[in-house]
């Protein structure tokens, strides 16, 4: 009799390849892990590469609570051309000589797009407008507007400015940039808006996500590597990286698992999700403080 395969619970940090949707990666991981219970936290455009956080088995319950509010990217912005999608995947809709744009002007434009800003997401995106994905409306040629949304760009740095010539002969500038931003920020839209501010248009030509919340690229594995050896971050380790920790004694652990709302120390008030750990180091549950007591968000013990 063969031993039944058991997929470990935990997070898988994937280095997503270009050309794959986030759903493609989930489908691939279901085959690798031999389970249907795989989900992802946050998405990456098909063109982009880098960190995509997946949850396997019980860890799928963790995904919705992960404090993945801050993300970090490396990318390339081309000044001098606009595209339909604000990235290199879309059709070029305008070209303008960008060779006279100065570094001072670029830095001033970047400064305007830093900090707490209102951003209009790209029209070719998954945002729903009256229940319909905006990319579907865009593909059908609809004329519509997406309301601006508040986002935070903690850091927007330009490392290099390179002269280049586009395929149609237009002199353009390629900027190598890094961005640290809140969840929901469109790097494509930053490229578009920087180009608009400089009067020459702009779009994103390359993007690599290097961090999502506490999970960095150095912990990520390619799909080929995961096919060879499935590397899963145990739930307890994943929770320790993402949430404040509350250690409880054996009695409190038992009460918590039986649904009793325990009194929580004041230090956890207003801190969002908190990981509860028993004396043996087992991750029991995610809770949040509500009127001084622990409200269960997800139970793992």
Curated annotation (Swiss-Prot):
It catalyses: uridine(55) in tRNA = pseudouridine(55) in tRNA. The keyword Repeat does not apply. Keywords: Isomerase, tRNA processing. Gene3D superfamilies: Pseudouridine synthase, PUA domain. It comes from the Bacteria. Its EC number is 5.4.99.25. The keyword tRNA processing applies. GO terms for biological process: mRNA pseudouridine synthesis; tRNA pseudouridine synthesis. It is an enzyme of class 5 (isomerase). The active site is at 45 (nucleophile). GO terms for molecular function: RNA binding; tRNA pseudouridine(55) synthase activity. InterPro entries: PsdUridine_synth_cat_dom_sf, PsdUridine_synth_N, PUA-like_sf, PUA_sf, tRNA_psdUridine_synth_fam2_C, tRNA_psdUridine_synth_TruB, TruB_C. Belongs to the pseudouridine synthase TruB family. Type 1 subfamily. Responsible for synthesis of pseudouridine from uracil-55 in the psi GC loop of transfer RNAs. This is tRNA pseudouridine synthase B. It comes from Streptomyces avermitilis (strain ATCC 31267 / DSM 46492 / JCM 5070 / NBRC 14893 / NCIMB 12804 / NRRL 8165 / MA-4680).
